[in-house]
């Protein structure tokens, strides 16, 4: 196999969910050069996988808002040339959207993707040379691995392997990361529940760390810090630095957000609080200790999270 070009551009959780497929491909084709096309904001994540030889950042989100700028079209032209220079034997689009399928079409190599019945945007399947049927009721990780296996001629192993190497610890502190921010209000947990869980974690000797990604989340972090003894607000860090904080945590508790899946990838003890989405399709999966509480239209209390935490082997 000369080379394999993966297209999985976004979002953060989707990028993490693609990593086991990369591991599978490398295991079955160890001599192939693996290249990954990913949205520029998530390029640091793609580079974390040791089997990836090259990352090609794409900037579709930014380009759409700047189509009248000459520099945008120069960037698009340079991106197309970069795609062609990859010279992959197989091009695999696990994103399954029209925009990702158009990227596949611009690349050189045999283009693989989902068939019209297996894809969110059926028109996207028109752009592929080879179309594969993959059940839509499977978890995203399984769908990525299945499509990749069908494209490359193997059946994935039962075990999930994200392929990531844990970054070294810089100190011996024990802390729990609380991911309270998410993309929709319907997926948010009440602050009183975060406070209840945070106070219990403090009583167990864990420092509570509060990340944030926007002004609304920063203000919530301030309120939680004021109510949870010994807690601290995490500085806003680059994505690769945030990864180090997650990978070396003793525990992660979070609502349905992309960063949650990094904890699963690094096998950090994890409690996922789901409120408005189905964890069976996009919830955290991995080989570490994972507990999912709640579910679509199910609201778990902080006592339920404490009960789950008491059963987990917290990292030291």
Regions found by a protein language model. Give the residues of each.
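Catalytic machinery of carbohydrate-active enzymes
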Residues: 1-316
